[in-house]
Amino acid sequence: MLLTFLGTSSGTPTRSRNVTSIALQLPQRSSLWLFDCGEGTQHQVLRTPLRLSQLEKVFFTHLHGDHLFGLVGLLASRALGSAGTTPVKLYGPPGLQEYVRATLRYSDTHINYPIHFQTVEPGLVLSEEGFTVLANALKHRISAFGYSVIEHDQPGRFDAERAAQLGIPFGPLYGQLKAGRTVALPDGRTVDGRTLVGPERKGRKLTYCSDTIYTPSAIELALGADVLIHEATYCEADLNLAERGLHSTAAMAARVAREAKVRQLILTHFSPRYEAGLAALRTEAEAIFPNVRMAEDFWRYEIKAVEAQLPKALVEQ
């Protein structure tokens, strides 16, 4: 699971940060998912290896402009590219479909591929081969949702090298061993396939929460996540601004990470008032939760799977 941060500023762009958008590339799939699509996102994509022709889904946390205004231009550019008639599905709060249809109509923009819409509610958003997406309501000035992308658990890895060392002939026997069965070899030995297949690999979990002030629903959504991406618009010194706008401080985001027992916290959605530096935000977050990274535009982050150890192979003579 590979993340590319396309925009990490809140409200307005700065010289070094565009407004919010995050790209997600999933393993063994050529599709691209976006989370939010602020103004200028398509320009950001042009400066990365990403391709709009691979865009499959866009998930919107809420409908404020710094998360939305880049969508229609991006869809229009995709229609002029090599995507053909491959559809795009848009997920978001009520009003998303009305906004997109009206903007396309009044700008006389024609899209040559299907656009599908799904209004998001707390709970299951989708479940398809390999992945499930869940949503939960956040606490912001308008309807807002956080998302969790959960990879389904994977079968354990088959150790073909060890099988070869044991003199097991390559062929149909490998399929039986991969399935964890005990097989008889031509020389009379038996091999327990379970000892050549690692433990089931737990799927990875990514949670994204923005925009929101501290809320228990974010903790519920992020519980046990490998990576939590959480907005950190302000530092605690500007708590009054966070409370007024229903945004999070870096300390609030760190509390969510700690209470949800996540592995890694990535902060994003920084107010332009901190353009000179984010040291204060990082310091206050690390005082609560040590594994903190500060997102930057075009930064790529891989969520790596945790590999389990194989047991010792059991071979009976």
UniProtKB/Swiss-Prot annotation:
Cofactor: Zn(2+)
Record carries keyword Nuclease: yes
EC number(s) on file: 3.1.26.11
UniProt-annotated binding residues for Zn(2+) 1: H62, H64, H140, D211
List of catalytic residues: D66
InterPro entries attached to this UniProt entry: Metallo-B-lactamas, RibonucZ/Hydroxyglut_hydro, RNase_Z/BN
PANTHER family cross-referenced by the UniProt entry: ZINC PHOSPHODIESTERASE ELAC PROTEIN 1
Family under the similarity heading: Belongs to the RNase Z family.
Assembly description: Homodimer.
Protein name as it appears in the record: Ribonuclease Z
Species, as recorded: Gloeobacter violaceus (strain ATCC 29082 / PCC 7421)
